[in-house]
Each structure stands twice: as C-alpha cells, then as structure tokens.
Amino acid sequence: MLGLKGCLTILIGYVIAVCALFSSRGRNPSLTDWEKLKDQKISNIDNFGLTGQHLLEFFQENLPFLSFSEEKYRHKHVSLYYDVFKEYILRRASSKKCLPVDSAIAKLNKDVNPMPVHSHNDYWRKLPLFEGLAYGASSTEADVWNIDEKILAVGHNEAYLDPVELTLDKLYTGPLLEILDEVNCQDSDSDRKNGVFFNSPETSLFFYIDFKSDDNELTYKLLMEQYFKSLIDSGYLTYYDMKKDEIIWRPVTVILTGNYPTSLDILDNGNDNGYFESNQRFAFLDAPLLSLEPKYSKLSVAATVSFSQLMKHCGSDHWKVSLRGRMDSNEISCAKSIIDGAHALKLKTRIWGAPTWPANLVETISRQIIHDLGSDLLNLDNLFMASSLI
C-alpha cells in the first residue's frame, strides 16, 4: 500500500496537472504556441476567430510572432502594430470573393454592439479608425490640415504632420471604402447599404472632420472632389435630399467641425441643387448647442458644446463640479433642458472637454452626461472605460 507521502505526491501531481489543463483553456496563444508557428506567416492566416477588444489584446500580446517572418514589415508605414493589423483586417477586402460573413467588419466587431461613444482624437490611437470600430464606437474624428493645396494630412499639431503616410485617405476614407465595398458586394446597386457594424449594419458612423487650416474653402473642395468622392459615388455617405427635404441615412455621416465653412454657397459649390448638382448635400455642420436655430434641422445632424461652456451657461463652473465630484440637480436640470431642445430639432448631442481625471470623477460625470442629461454621444479618450459605462 502507498504511504502517506506517496498519496500526497500523487494528489499534488494530479492538482498540478488539472491546473495546467484549465489554465490553457480560453486564453490567447502564448509564446510557446507561436514558437510552433515560426514558419507560418500572418499573410497565410485569414481569421484568428477573435473580435473586438479580444482581437486588439491578441495582437498586442503576440505582435513579434505575427510579424517576424514577414519581410514586408521591416519598413513601417505607420507603425509595425498598425501595418500588421491593417494587413490582416483588409486582406480579404482586396480579393474578388464576395463573403460578408468573413469580412473585415466581421473580424473587427462581430458580437460587439455599437455604443454611443465618440472616439475623441481617434487619430492618436495606435490603430486609427480600426480601434474605435473594434470597440463599437459609433462616432470618430480626424483633424485635417491642407498641405500644398492638394493633400489633407491628419494630426493634432501642424509641426508633427506626415503628408505621406498619415493622410485622410490612407487612415480613413481608403479603409472605409474597402470595408464597405466588402459588405455590400452582393448588391452594390441597392439603395440599402450595410454599414461598419456587424451586429447593426443599419447604424451610421458619425465621421467628424475637424478643419485646422485657414483656407477652409479649399479644404472642403478637396474633401468633396478627392477624399469623399468614391464614398459618394458608391452611395455610402448620408445626405440631405433637397427635393424631398429630408435626410437620407447611409453607412457614414460626415460632420464638419472646427474652422469649417458655413456659407451655403461654399457647401453647395455655388449651385442651387447641391455641390454635384444632384440635389444632395453630403456634409453636415456641427451645430452650436447653446445657440441653436430651426435651420440646423436641415444643416446638421448633431450639436456640440464643451463641458465648461455648458456649466458656465447654467450659472456654474466646471471646477466647482470637479471639486464636488458630480453635477448637482440645478446643473442637471439646466443642461438637460438644452439637450432636450436639440432633440426637438432631431439633433444628436455631444459634450466634449469633461473632466479627464481622476477615474472615479470621469466615471461619475460620464454617467451623468449619458443617463441624467440624455446626451447622445459620450466623448472619451479611453474606449475601454467608455465601454464599461454605457
């Protein structure tokens, strides 16, 4: 018979084996797993079976092993992470196969519900456009600068622009066209277009274009005639129908913000029937939430205000709110009435510039903005936090 020590040894060995078995389940591939695939290239792998946040984590953890055998990644375009991720996501989009169920959108956000979150400063993310879509953020933004009167570079500061790789077409409009073509391949002539969210193809992505350059008329001309033209021709942009006097929703809704032109003469290219003389206007203005007029129901789909401006308008101060840790009942009542006014004009609302630190204050104010004020888009840099607040 086995002695006490023998029984304990067997028991301990059994426990270790069981723990090892269960620890290997439900996890991302490890270093050991990838060492077995040293001769495998990411370009030979169509689908890892991961979406959303899990896909992002997987790439971050295994990036060296996803790219070490690929000579084309020796010279980066944006970053090694971005280049590898984009190549994986868009691989099938460049093929002639029509299979929306295995599309870039399916890889990015299958089983991820769109959330009313604005991906603030999206171009600063490690994966511009793609990260927001993976989390299900239903709004994004790009700051654009006019370079040499022909290129729209994306960036926050003019001193750090890259007019070769970090451009509006390479980071946003090009990928958007590819992934939308991929999920609309079965009937490209249909008026019904599938959007960028697998679980909700009817949801339109709000795309804020923040004008940074002084010559906003030229920037707008480049947007219409160069950067958005293919999306317009394919029927992917929401537009205002001048004849029917209504907004026709499509997969992407362009909203002009920042130093944008407000003259209808510029917006419609001097025509009474729209920029392309089609009785359609393909860009909407970011309406001022504190000074709304009835005209914005046709010119806009969303209204915006900063948190500090909103609190000042309500006779308070954003510092008071921060020190208190939350908005009080008077501030909530005042702010909610303003947002209700925007909703009466059928406009969505966005409040930017809310406190960003500490985390508990951010969470409290964010919840109040969405649930107490009834604002439509939560404006946050941290998408992981945003996903837990909605």
From Swiss-Prot:
Signal peptide: 1-26
Listed InterPro entries: AIM6_PI-PLC-like_dom, HAT_RTT109-like, PLC-like_Pdiesterase_TIM-brl
Any one Gene Ontology BP term: lipid metabolic process
Keywords annotated in UniProt: Signal
GO MF term list: phosphoric diester hydrolase activity
Keyword flag Lipid metabolism: no
CDD domains: PI-PLCc_GDPD_SF_unchar3 (cd08577)
Domain of life: Eukaryota
Protein family according to the UniProt entry: Belongs to the AIM6 family.
Name of this chain's protein: Altered inheritance of mitochondria protein 6
Organism the protein comes from: Saccharomyces cerevisiae (strain YJM789) (Baker's yeast)
